[in-house]
Amino acid sequence: MSESRTSADGGMETSYGFREVPDGQKQGLVNQVFHKVAKRYDIMNDVMSMGMHRAWKDAMISALNPRKEPGYKVLDVAGGTGDIAFRIVEASGRQAHATVLDINGSMLGVGAERAEKKKLSGNLTFVEANAEELPFEAGSFDAYTIAFGIRNVPRIDAALSEAYRVLKRGGRLLVLEFSEVDMPLLDKIYDAWSFNAIPQFGKAITGDAEPYQYLVESIRKFPNQENFAAMIRQAGFSRVTFTNYTGGIAALHSGWKL
């Protein structure tokens, strides 16, 4: 879980994968990871999920069911390459406007380039900012989405509080994230894949295994489904639920600002 702890010398520390690092260092380390993988991010997701992330994202968009009417506004956080935002805009019949927010400029650059090629630039705004301090007024969005990004935020509680703040009354939060496998045999298989195969595939694809090692470790440090649902409730959300995908390899969390 990404929560701060006091170190032996009295400073505050948080987890970066299986390592403990000073609070102020995690964001910079995470940024380095995503600068390295930005241009191969979709391949990275294929490796991390054994290709299943595409079906999970489709299920997320189906759950959101974006309105097919002008004025529907979605904030997609940690969505730099645009994958989720593109799906939302298309599912709305190109009526929705999606603001793609990411702290990493390299990821946003990839997304903006793809948006232009898809002729979706008019439906999208790309913003470089921190999920813990969103540069938007309260009640600005109908929906807030984040896919495979919340576990990389140093202060998850702050990000959830900000999500609640910027949503309109009646707005919805959807968080898709790797989670805790709830099937013993699958758990063993997925662990073997994660710790043995994923870093090596990453090295073969990008020449660097370290980003993939961090990403695998960050999944194991993330709160399980029940604990993360409790964090969402603590941020003020109502009707909080989660749905497991592929035996809990991933989970979709939902909450409403009522």
Swiss-Prot record:
Family annotation (Gene3D superfamilies): Vaccinia Virus protein VP39 (3.40.50.150)
UniProt key word Transferase: yes
Catalytic activity entry: a 2-demethylmenaquinol + S-adenosyl-L-methionine = a menaquinol + S-adenosyl-L-homocysteine + H(+); a 2-methoxy-6-(all-trans-polyprenyl)benzene-1,4-diol + S-adenosyl-L-methionine = a 5-methoxy-2-methyl-3-(all-trans-polyprenyl)benzene-1,4-diol + S-adenosyl-L-homocysteine + H(+)
GO terms classed as biological process: aerobic respiration; menaquinone biosynthetic process; methylation
Gene Ontology MF terms: 2-methoxy-6-polyprenyl-1,4-benzoquinol methyltransferase activity; demethylmenaquinone methyltransferase activity
Span list, region Disordered: 1-21
Keyword terms of this UniProt record: Menaquinone biosynthesis, Methyltransferase, S-adenosyl-L-methionine, Transferase, Ubiquinone biosynthesis
Organism in which the protein naturally occurs: Rhizobium johnstonii (strain DSM 114642 / LMG 32736 / 3841)
Keyword Methyltransferase attributed: yes
Pathway: Quinol/quinone metabolism; menaquinone biosynthesis; menaquinol from 1,4-dihydroxy-2-naphthoate: step 2/2; Cofactor biosynthesis; ubiquinone biosynthesis
Family of the protein in this entry: Belongs to the class I-like SAM-binding methyltransferase superfamily. MenG/UbiE family.
Record-listed E.C. numbers: 2.1.1.163, 2.1.1.201
Name of the protein in its database record: Ubiquinone/menaquinone biosynthesis C-methyltransferase UbiE
Record-listed S-adenosyl-L-methionine binding positions: 81, 102, 130-131
Function (record text): Methyltransferase required for the conversion of demethylmenaquinol (DMKH2) to menaquinol (MKH2) and the conversion of 2-polyprenyl-6-methoxy-1,4-benzoquinol (DDMQH2) to 2-polyprenyl-3-methyl-6-methoxy-1,4-benzoquinol (DMQH2).
